[in-house]
């Protein structure tokens, strides 16, 4: 029983190679079935995302090259192309790597939480194919508890490191409750969709989506029960907005100083937060000069993100310490299991020898042999049988010039205690 992790990721391989080595839904089941039938593999879990492909296995001794060969053959990629980008971890290093990955310590965005869900899905997919053996079952369950511990004891995922999330975090800091706030979203692209998801997750239920094309805005609005307006209608609705978040591809500003000034008068100068994450700007810079208007640009958000990344790096130090501690503890537990198996096998072998010699001795007694002679012969044979393997091990260690091994065997047999 030996743990093995092989893979490629965004650190080691180009997008082109990662695409070639990915296990899509159409390939995954077949791959797990092949690994289950592989002579060198006891169990396997395959993790395949846009940034990494990794195969975790419980393997027989010396299976490293066989699993690499299998990966090469399965994807029909030459070893000369695959190997330079491939990393291989064994035993405790494999345990530590899986735990680091699951905690977001090896992610493109440090501390991102999505990877844990992807690892859980990979484990679930492998269980569906009955590819997870007892060792991997224990490893993945332990990994999930370690990831939970890292999230609980550190703040590695608590600081915004995406523009969309940073915009929502800023809004939460300025307004006491997003549940009571009305948000105007200008644009309906990917960034605004992410913003809407974060806002919705934080209790915001009053959203207005303004976009050039109504169809795209409707698609977004349906997800969050939002109102849809055109860009031309923004002046009529701006006064309703406590928060404005804008991200379009417009070459010219959409929201001007005069428009905001009018809206603030209608709001009786209740504060308005405007977050402009478009390049070029959607909101005129002069809006920031108005009292009660708080304008933040993508550059302002980037400084927040940079600061948060540094904070995550600090939190990662503690997370790494937790992973080191937990991976070492799991490896110790795994080794203790291996010792239990060895002890069981050794005891079984000794019992088989005893039963065999006892049967022969009883037959001799039944045939009328001298009991004393039978007992002496039994004790001699039992001694010779039981010391044969240790004696041979001592001889080999001495012949091969391995004093350290010789010392270990002597200690195991308790010979030094007899002096």
UniProtKB/Swiss-Prot annotation:
Enzyme nomenclature, EC number: 1.2.1.70
Binding positions (substrate): 49-52, 107, 112-114, 118
Pfam short name (any one): GlutR_N
UniProt-annotated site: Important for activity, residues: 97
Binding annotation for NADP(+): 187-192
Active site: 50 (nucleophile)
An annotated Gene Ontology molecular function: NADP binding
Pathways involved: Porphyrin-containing compound metabolism; protoporphyrin-IX biosynthesis; 5-aminolevulinate from L-glutamyl-tRNA(Glu): step 1/2
Recorded superkingdom: Bacteria
Catalytic reaction annotation: (S)-4-amino-5-oxopentanoate + tRNA(Glu) + NADP(+) = L-glutamyl-tRNA(Glu) + NADPH + H(+)
GO biological process per UniProt: protoporphyrinogen IX biosynthetic process from glutamate
Keywords, ordered alphabetically: NADP, Oxidoreductase, Porphyrin biosynthesis
InterPro entries recorded: 4pyrrol_synth_GluRdtase (IPR000343), 4pyrrol_synth_GluRdtase_dimer (IPR015896), 4pyrrol_synth_GluRdtase_N (IPR015895), GluRdtase_CS (IPR018214), GluRdtase_dimer_dom_sf (IPR036453), GluRdtase_N_sf (IPR036343), NAD(P)-bd_dom_sf (IPR036291), Shikm_DH/Glu-tRNA_Rdtase (IPR006151)
Assembly, per entry: Homodimer.
Entry text on domains: Possesses an unusual extended V-shaped dimeric structure with each monomer consisting of three distinct domains arranged along a curved 'spinal' alpha-helix. The N-terminal catalytic domain specifically recognizes the glutamate moiety of the substrate. The second domain is the NADPH-binding domain, and the third C-terminal domain is responsible for dimerization.
Role played: Catalyzes the NADPH-dependent reduction of glutamyl-tRNA(Glu) to glutamate 1-semialdehyde (GSA).
Entry's family note: Belongs to the glutamyl-tRNA reductase family.
Misc note: During catalysis, the active site Cys acts as a nucleophile attacking the alpha-carbonyl group of tRNA-bound glutamate with the formation of a thioester intermediate between enzyme and glutamate, and the concomitant release of tRNA(Glu). The thioester intermediate is finally reduced by direct hydride transfer from NADPH, to form the product GSA.
Protein name: Glutamyl-tRNA reductase
Taxonomic lineage: Bacteria, Pseudomonadati, Pseudomonadota, Gammaproteobacteria, Vibrionales
Gene behind the chain: hemA
